[in-house]
Amino acid sequence: MSLDDIDSWSIIVVTDELLNFIIFMGCMYDLIGIENFDKENEQWPTDVREISPNHNIDNLRIQWKNWFSDILKMKSKKVKFGEVELNNILVELMYDIDSFKELDYKELREYCIESYPIFMKWWNMPAGGKNALEFHELIESTKVHECIMSIENKIKRKSKPFKLHVDVVYTGVPTVLDFSDNYIVITPNGHVAFNKNWWMRKLKKLV
């Protein structure tokens, strides 16, 4: 979803499929550090599956963390250079979903193959997955708009031109991942949804 004030600012709130799949797969095999969860953002699915005896769990966790970080850096770079056509990255456009051969972290491939259809079933549920997160796109965008109007009233001028890209993931990020002035990752829960003071501090830097 996009909210904008013509010739001034733009806020793009997206439920990115790829980021949410990476988190889903990480939860499914217990590859995400416990520090990424709290009472507002719990690990789900909770039915953790066993990994192959040929793989080391610590190595898989490192690979998962690096993969997640790689995708965030890629998205942040594209936001910086205005490549907004890739707001929502679909898994099947990045990878061959039958093999995930494009994934550099080879040991993760079999877990991606196994978890992808399970993820997509949940992701496309009428009352869950993507639809639940898209509801928060609307809520977050509306409240952010209100914050910008409040700041404009205080400083008695219109906002400077800026673009803010917000990715929404369903869990795994207990605090905001503030990559840059123009790119952040949040969950529907926790202190950012909706922490007005945090948003006011963030937006004052942009407005």
Question: What spans do the regions from the language model cover?
Answer:
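Auxiliary, metal-adjacent structural segments of Zn-dependent hydrolase domains
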Residues: F119-I184
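Active-site recognition of the HExxH zinc-binding catalytic motif
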Residues: I186-T187, H191-V207
